[in-house]
């Protein structure tokens, strides 16, 4: 035997996530728990981690991105992190942010209130949440619009061009969506 090889698995250590904390997803997202991260304040460990991630892609000379989406970050619950993403895309001036303004159980009036508070040419928000099939469990789940909208933008750019709106029957169909979580009336859609 010329060479001896050993494989030793990692033991102990800490990856920053406490295994005793539940990982709240989808309709369970709250300010204190989004995907296992505490985002309740600007100094919470989850908020600090997200801001580090946002800052790491903030230089347009280092990272060529044109679309940013952070499912699980809901403006109504996580405004600090949400606003940091807006600050980053506005400073870059070459990327667009698809954000979620409300959670699954929030009303259209709450979505309008949160959406009106955003004044940026670099942000798009959508409502309501969407029902889709979970590819792992083959069951119906509710996801924020920011999960499926990047695919619509990419499809739109492939069949048309960036300056065409991802709307209508040809470019605005939501591939992967089964239904919406809250069906809006005609009057609500016009607001």
Annotate each language-model stretch with its function:
Residues 1-191:
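A glycine- and small-residue-enriched flexible loop/hinge signal that marks low-structured segments
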């Amino acid at each position: 035997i010329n060479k001896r090889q050993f494989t030793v698995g990692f033991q102990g250590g800490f990856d920053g996530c406490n295994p005793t904390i539940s990982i709240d997803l989808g309709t369970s997202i709250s300010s204190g728990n989004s995907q296992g991260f505490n985002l309740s304040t600007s100094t919470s460990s989850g908020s600090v981690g997200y801001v580090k991630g946002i800052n790491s892609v903030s230089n347009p000379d280092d990272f060529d991105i044109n679309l940013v989406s952070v499912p699980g970050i809901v403006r109504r619950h996580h405004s600090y992190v949400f606003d940091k993403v807006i600050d980053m895309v506005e400073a870059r001036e070459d990327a667009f942010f698809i954000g979620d303004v409300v959670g699954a159980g929030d009303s259209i009036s709450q979505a309008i209130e949160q959406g009106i508070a955003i004044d940026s040419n670099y942000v798009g928000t959508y409502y309501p949440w969407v029902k889709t099939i979970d590819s792992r469990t083959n069951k119906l789940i509710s996801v924020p619009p920011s999960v499926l909208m990047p695919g619509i933008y990419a499809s739109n750019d492939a069949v048309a061009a960036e300056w065409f709106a991802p709307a209508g029957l040809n470019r605005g169909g939501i591939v992967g969506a089964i239904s919406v979580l809250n069906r809006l009336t005609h009057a609500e859609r016009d607001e």
